[in-house]
């Protein structure tokens, strides 16, 4: 089972009261529903690839409207695609759709009732239904952080984004596959969204993974920084040693002032140590790190002068 399916499975087990159930059904039917006519009456079909969601729709219709629907399974053999589960309401579909306020001229309306947007818990329930109908979320252990909800209509997609942003989620929208999506890419916002639609256990699991990932990334950054510093120190040390050996081969270290000679000889004798450690090893020391660095820069400059004079000759 995918991570997104686990989140949805948790959501289908949430207990809700009538108004919240209606809001959830509004989203599920608006996004996955279609209307037909049989025996001179409306028939409602709500389609999903997730059996838990199909059972959820069936249960909500029975619990809050007292109607019996049926679940039709269409098995897809080609390319081993998932089965399709259709919750079909043959009787009382007109009553359910009228009560939900999503039927207009025998079509499902794109608009969301204004009164729903005024109630925080109904908005949460609508978002839960929208996620069940068209949502997905990446596994935080293996992928980049990403949660999205797909909608066929742009206006409805924008309404979902507005709902999400009522909770400060910074949701963004874009066109996708003959439809539109609203998406989140920030880990904290994804966790907040899962919490507000009721996926508490999934949110806690997500947060645990995020903490481990963040710690691992922090350690990696520290290791990379340390490696970069070590490389920088090694390169600087190599240059210092090359310059000291060059000076020794041309004029001899004994020709240097005592302070420069001491640091030069100490560096040759201790090529792997840091500047701080080098300052503690100088016979006339100890010398501060800045003092050691100052003397080594003088040696580097002197070596450059000697090379320049050779070029002129």
Curated annotation (Swiss-Prot):
GO biological process: cell division; regulation of sporulation
Keywords: Cell cycle, Cell division, DNA-binding
Pfam families, per database record: HTH_WhiA, LAGLIDADG_WhiA, WhiA_N
DNA-binding region: 274-308
Superkingdom classification of source: Bacteria
InterPro entries associated with the record: Homing_endonucl, Sporu_reg_WhiA_N_dom, Sporulation_regulator_WhiA, Sporulation_regulator_WhiA_C, WhiA_LAGLIDADG_dom
UniProt cross-references to Gene3D superfamilies, sorted A to Z: Homing endonucleases
GO MF term set: DNA binding
Family: Belongs to the WhiA family.
Record function comment: Involved in cell division and chromosome segregation.
Name of the protein in question: Probable cell division protein WhiA
Organism: Limosilactobacillus reuteri (strain DSM 20016) (Lactobacillus reuteri)
